[in-house]
Amino acid sequence: MNQPIPTGSRDILPEEMRELRAIESTLAELFESRGYGEVATPTIEFHDVIALADRPKDGSYRFFDEAGSMLALRSDMTVPIARLVANRFASQDGPFRLRYSGSAYRTVRPQRGQMREFRQIGIELSGAAAPGGTVEIVELLVGALDAVGLDRAVVGLGDADLFRQLLADMGVEGAARDRILDCLARHDLVAIEAEAGDLAGIGEEQRAAIVALSSLRGGSEVLERASEIGGAAVERASSRLAETYEGLEAKGMAGRVQLDLGLLRDLGYYTGAILEVYDPALGHVLGGGGRYDDLLGRFGRAMPAAGFALYLERVHIAQAEEERMAREQGARSKEQGASGVGGAA
């Protein structure tokens, strides 16, 4: 009898497992070479710890232990590591450079093809403020993508506070604000336009600003355009993005980064720069991260922090697709070369 497994989970067979381990090993060696030491945290945390992430939609699997305490499977890796840094390095000075790999778990929406269990590999840098700390993690992220053959991948760079401040200055609050932020997190620009059209108490110019900023992306030129559209409301976020982008230009990394002013993630702890990774060979985000300068303070050890995580299975799929495309391009070039030689004869 064929026994099914839950939707959103999967078995991994030996060949794929070897390939996943190879990616993991390559990235682990890179992170270690940059001074990031490996840590591990429990799969199970007290739910109160997970709740400190302040995610609008928690998504964690919760249950009770024998003593009646509410526990949860970790729904990401950043929060447990923030707890670890605050608890285990309480008397030490930073910065702390840590790396990890492990599985996280979230509830899924039926029929969406979402995974309940997903493996992440990433780094967390605690005790390094922006813009220097942000530049460091973006530089390492680009290096990680190159190390696994994803040199066409692009890092989207936005700011978590840009739209929050813009909407606050417009007086957009409560459920209306949350709907727009949710649309941004889902990259649903059509829905943003609809939501902006339904907002009460703001003018057409403000509606147009919401829609225009949500789709504004490119190089440093977009920051000037953002100031023209959003005015003082976006000045702080634009200034931070400009500082980070200048640091990336100095490192020769700006060509791999796209400023995306509509970028927002559904994790409530981000406070400044936010990142997402895209590769043209895959229609899904490969990973993401950003700054979470307030999160460690919730555990009693206030310090600036930033990090990123890559979805291991998605990186593997993108890598395989890039290799397939390279083989096909090589075969076409060979055929064209042979055809040219034959024609000359």
Predicted segments, located by residue:
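Short, conserved phosphate-binding/catalytic loop or strand-edge motifs used
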Residues: 117-121, 157-165
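Generic N-terminal amphipathic, Lys/Arg-enriched alpha-helix
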Residues: 4-13, 226
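Polyanion/phosphate-binding surface patch
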Residues: 39-71
